[in-house]
Amino acid sequence: MAETKSGKSGLISHGVAAQNRKARFDYTIKETVEAGLVLKGPEVKSLRHGRATLSEAWAGERDGEMFLFNAYIPEYQGGVLSRFEPRSPRKLLLKRKQINHLLGAVQKQGQTVVPLQIHFNERGMAKVLLGVAEGRNKADKRAAIASRDWQRDKARLMREKG
């Protein structure tokens, strides 16, 4: 999904606002689920400027509801001073069936729910793409790097010959 920024303001109207690139390297993603995100006004503005970080974020359960923990959305600098905690838990909007499915996956050994990206849909709503993931060990990570390098070398050889 490509970022589309509105003219002079440089704000993201729809498209990817933040991405967790390290999650796809550290985990094997089994399935993905899209969830809504409850945000305050300044948090939305900060996201539209593309200033969020998901590298240390994770999703978990609290009181029967799913929350996004440790996602860094900094304070919006261009407006009225409104104090909020940049790493506060943010509620995820999911149906009960989806929550039960995710919690069932978490109960399995070694699986976790990680946020893969925050994006704005065509209607301008903030959404989080969650992945049900299984941790990788060092050997798996090395194999992924070797495979990626081989694909790059193969493409380079084909360009040179072809």
From Swiss-Prot:
- Role description: Required for rescue of stalled ribosomes mediated by trans-translation. Binds to transfer-messenger RNA (tmRNA), required for stable association of tmRNA with ribosomes. tmRNA and SmpB together mimic tRNA shape, replacing the anticodon stem-loop with SmpB. tmRNA is encoded by the ssrA gene; the 2 termini fold to resemble tRNA(Ala) and it encodes a 'tag peptide', a short internal open reading frame. During trans-translation Ala-aminoacylated tmRNA acts like a tRNA, entering the A-site of stalled ribosomes, displacing the stalled mRNA.
Q: List UniProt keywords, sorted A-Z.
A: Cytoplasm, RNA-binding
Name the record gives this protein: SsrA-binding protein
SUPFAM superfamilies per the UniProt record, alphabetical: Small protein B (SmpB)
Pfam families membership: SmpB (PF01668)
Name where it's found: Cytoplasm
Q: Name one GO biological process term.
A: trans-translation
Can you name the source organism? Granulibacter bethesdensis (strain ATCC BAA-1260 / CGDNIH1)
Family, per entry: Belongs to the SmpB family.
The superkingdom listed in its UniProt entry is Bacteria
Query: What GO cellular component term, any one, is given?
Result: cytosol
A GO molecular function for this record? RNA binding
Q: Tell me yes or no: is Ion transport among this UniProt entry's keywords.
A: no
The keyword RNA-binding belongs to this UniProt entry's keyword annotation? yes
Task: Provide the gene name from the record.
Answer: smpB
